[in-house]
Amino acid sequence: MRDQSAAAPPDSRFGAADDPASVVENRTRLAAAVGTRPGSVPIGLQVHKADIAVHDGPQEPSPYAEPGTALEEVDGHVVRGPGLAPLVLTADCLPVALAGPGGVAMLHCGWRGLAAGIIARGALAVEAKSAAIGPGIGPCCFEVGPEVVAEFRAAFGE
C-alpha cells in the first residue's frame, strides 16, 4: 500500500500495473504541491536520448494528466514561459536543472543521453548560467562495461 499523504506521490507514471485514475490524481496533487495545474507541468516519455522539447506556455488539455495520451519522446524540457514547472522522472539517472536568460531546462540524464550531449543541448537552449544536479546511481552500484566506455570515447575523446 502506497502512502497517499506525501506531497509528491511516487505512482506518477502510466504503466501496465498502474491504475490510470491513481496516476491522474497523483499528478494533479504533484502539480498542486508546486503551486500549479497539470497543464503547466511538461512531461515526456523518457527514452534515454538527447532530445529536448521547448515549451512556451501551458498545454491544455494536458497530456500530463490524461491517460492514453501519447507523450512526446523527450528526455528534457526547456520552458520559456511563466508558470511552467518542467518534470523528469528518475531512478538511476541524474536529474539536471539548468537556468539562464533563455529559460529553464530540466533534463533526464542517463549515460546514453550524456554521451549524446543532452546537457550541452540544454545549456545552449537556455544560455545556462547555473546548474543543479540531483541524486543518481553511483560507482558503488553501477558497473560500466566496455560498450559504455567506447560510447563516451567516441563522443568526447580520450
Model-derived regions, located:
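Active-site microenvironment for binding and transforming phosphate-containing groups
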Residues: M1-E158
